[in-house]
Structure formats: C-alpha cells, structure tokens
Design a protein with these regions (language model features):
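Non-catalytic, solvent-exposed segments at the cell envelope interface
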Residues: 1-10, 14-298
C-alpha cells in the first residue's frame, strides 16, 4: 500500500507522458483533490516554500483505512523530500506502530493514531515533532483508491520471492500479475514474512516500480480519464493545481535519484500490554540529520 500511494504522487510530480495530454482534465481533478489545512506554513519554517526559487520541499504521504463509522488510521506514513538542485528525492517510511509523542495530547502512542485523533493536521504535527523537520504538504489516499488505480492500469507485474497466502489469495514464487485487491493483499502481508514489516516494504518497492512503468505506457495515456476520476475520488492534498504544474516543470529531475532511508534499528516492545515499535533516539537523530540536509535546513 505504501508504494501504491507513492506511485500516485510520482504520477503527479514527475511528469509521465500523459501529463500534458490531459492538462485540462487534471485541472478539473485537482479541484476535487484540493483540501487545504488550517495553517499557511509549518511552525518549523519561517517562510513558505517558494517553487519559483526551486526550494526543496517535503510531503507527508498518508494511506488511510477508513471504515464506516470509524475516523480511520493512517496505515501508511511516508515522508518524502524533494531537492531539485541535488536532483534527488528521499523517502522515509515510518512504521505504523512506532512509539511516538502525539502532538497536542501530551502522551505517547502508536504514531498512526495521530490521524484518528486529529486528522491530517495532527498527523503532520506529530511527524514534524518526531523528525524535527517541516512538512510542507500532504497527500492522503483512501486505500480503496489504491485498488482502483491498479485496476485502471490493468494490473501490476511483480516477481515474488516468498510463497505465501494473504487475504484469500495465494502468491507463489515467480512472475505474477496482480489486480487491485490482490496487490493490496500482497503489500499488507507481514506476519508470515521472516523480515516482518521490512519484508513487506521490499514488496511495496516492487509495486511502485511496476506502477510507474504502467503509468508511462501508451495504454495508460488512453485510460487517462479513468485514472483522473480515480484520483479525484480517492486522493486529497493541499497542493494546488498551479503548484503541481510548477513541480512538474521544475522538479521532475529530482526523480532521477530516489533514495530510501529507514528506521529499521528499532525493537518490538510491549508497553502496558500493547505492542509498539520503539526506535532508539540515536537512530531518529541520524534520520533527522539526513532529512534536514535534504531540505537544506542547516
């Protein structure tokens, strides 16, 4: 799911071949997607990011599992920094069970609870506090939208290295073509993986590569209307249409070098009978240093 979410972002910001073909359609879809939050600039910035000056910027990607009568939790939390001068994009996936201080509540809990307690704004502020960086923008996707996107693309191709069953589907070793529901199950499995959540992230990395390949194909261009409808229905962001255009024009070379960093030095602990993923302070400090460097916050 994480990588399906990231792929939606890259389809927006790195300029697939269909971008200019569907300029006006994207404008319409972006109006449906646009959902500002109650702040103009992060408390960790003095000034707003300037796309005209090609400032580095950051995005919090949220994959939300919302059910009827439930505010939902962010099953996916990814921080993305984009630096056009370095021609580099950095991705940090935050394990959903991470033990963290929840902004505005004065207590610690699983970091994915922040969204359930206070929506996008509290989720952003919680991650900002943990990583000591500003989060300039967010992109939120309904998990059901991930299914829709995969299906519109005609499925995704993966090479599976671990035979397992998940969500009622069997995934044998070898080359597979997955539809949306299968892809969700493929990316959610972690209990039977010897590498746990990090094994799941490896499968998710493969999903994004497949989605990006499909996203730049001729068949995708011909199905652009369906893709944009899926985006408009399932994706929300505080990025405006003009900002998306600026990113497409001036930042797409940042996708030339995509680096993933991780928080894999944590340990599994039970605190008051509840399972958490506890990350050492020195690990968080090291990640803070990397991300602040990418945002040129010295």
């Amino acid at each position: 799911v994480k990588w399906g979410l990231v792929s939606l972002v890259f389809l927006l910001v790195t300029g697939t071949g269909c971008f200019f073909v569907v300029y006006h359609s994207l404008h319409s879809a972006s109006k449906d997607m646009h959902s500002p939050i109650d702040r103009d600039v992060s408390a960790k910035r003095d000034d707003q990011v300037s796309f005209d000056e090609k400032d580095p910027f950051s995005v919090l990607l949220l994959g939300i599992d919302e059910r009827e009568g439930d505010a939902g939790r962010s099953d996916t939390m990814i921080v993305l920094t984009v630096n056009p001068d370095k021609k580099k994009t950095t991705l940090l996936s935050i394990p959903r069970d991470t033990y963290a201080e929840i902004s505005g509540r004065g207590d610690k809990n699983k970091i994915n609870h922040a969204y359930a307690y206070g929506g996008v704004k509290m989720a952003m502020e919680t991650v900002e506090h943990m990583l000591d960086i500003p989060l300039d923008y967010y992109i939120k996707v309904n998990m059901e939208g991930f299914e829709d996107m995969i299906d519109v693309l005609g499925g995704v191709k993966v090479t599976n290295s671990l035979a397992f069953e998940s969500g009622g589907y069997r995934f044998p070793v070898g080359d597979l073509v997955l539809n949306g529901k299968q892809a969700l199950s493929y990316t959610r499995m972690r209990q039977d993986d010897p590498d746990g959540d990090f094994g799941r992230q490896e499968r998710q990395r493969e999903i994004i590569q497949s989605v990006l390949r499909q996203g730049s194909s001729l068949s995708t261009i011909l199905n652009t209307g369906d893709i944009l409808q899926s985006l408009g229905e399932n994706v929300k962001t505080n990025l405006t249409f003009n900002q998306l255009i600026d990113i497409q024009n001036d930042y797409r070379q940042a996708a030339d070098h995509i680096e993933q960093i991780s928080l894999d030095a944590g340990t599994n602990k039970y605190i008051n009978g509840i399972y958490f993923y506890v990350i050492p302070e020195e690990t968080i400090a090291a990640v803070q240093k990397v991300l602040r460097g990418e945002l040129e916050l010295y």
